[in-house]
């Protein structure tokens, strides 16, 4: 079914969908698995859910996003958030650089959308949401996916931030800016930046993640515009 077809008699479709969700009779539709090729030639596994499933995913995201914005996401995190994008990350970075913190521990997270289960992701959400019936439905929505954070769903961007928020919470006291899955910590010496690199690595390890070593480094003499570049 296309979006155009869904819109025909949409009120009735939404009422029926709400009833299925309320009674527990809802089941997910078939997924179309695709491979997206980036401009650098890298291939990223992705999925295309049915229109109805995307409606469910968007509704669930709309329900939990305000809660996570208030309880889970740090002020220094941009990307996958309303009003917080690469521009806000660059502004925050420029402020730290202008204050004299010219050494940057720059860490890109390796395969952030891989290596989790529906039950595990639901446990992350349960740290902030106490509604048991919602959490059970949330887990049911994730279970058919090849990976709960796989690109292509309406929930994936939010869940990437939820996953990384668990590492973010371990980085208190540092001048940190994160854009999507890229951390930068601003320091006043090489030694401090090396320590920050270790702190990020340790925080990620506690969450089952690790840096992409090919894209992570300590550097200085950087302009804000050089940071958070998308390399595909």
Regions found by a protein language model. Give the residues of each.
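Conserved pre-catalytic core of RNA-dependent polymerases
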Residues: 1-150
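Generic preference for hydrophobic/aromatic residues in regular secondary structure cores
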Residues: 28-33, 211-218, 227
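Conserved polymerase palm-domain catalytic core
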Residues: 75, 90-221
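Short, low-order "capping/linker" segments at domain edges
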Residues: 224-232
């Amino acid at each position: 079914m296309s979006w155009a077809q869904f819109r025909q008699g949409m009120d009735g479709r939404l009422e029926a969908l709400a009833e299925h969700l309320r009674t527990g009779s809802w089941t997910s539709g078939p997924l179309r698995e695709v491979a997206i090729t980036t401009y650098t030639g890298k291939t990223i596994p992705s999925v295309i859910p049915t229109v109805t499933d995307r409606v469910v995913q968007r509704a669930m995201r709309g329900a939990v996003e305000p809660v996570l914005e208030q309880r889970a996401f740090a002020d220094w995190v941009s990307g996958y958030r309303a009003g917080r994008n690469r521009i806000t990350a660059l502004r925050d970075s420029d402020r730290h650089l202008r204050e004299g913190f010219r050494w940057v521990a720059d860490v890109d997270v390796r395969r952030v959308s891989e290596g989790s289960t529906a039950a595990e992701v639901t446990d992350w959400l349960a740290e902030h949401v106490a509604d048991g019936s919602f959490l059970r439905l949330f887990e049911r929505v994730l279970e058919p996916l090849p990976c709960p954070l796989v690109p292509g769903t309406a929930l994936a961007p939010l869940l990437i931030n939820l996953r990384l928020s668990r590492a973010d919470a371990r980085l208190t006291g540092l001048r940190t800016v994160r854009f999507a899955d890229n951390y930068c910590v601003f320091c006043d010496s090489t030694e401090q930046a090396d320590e920050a690199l270790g702190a990020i690595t340790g925080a990620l390890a506690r969450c089952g993640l690790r840096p992409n070593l090919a894209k992570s480094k300590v550097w200085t003499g950087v302009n804000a515009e050089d940071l958070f570049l998308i390399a595909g």
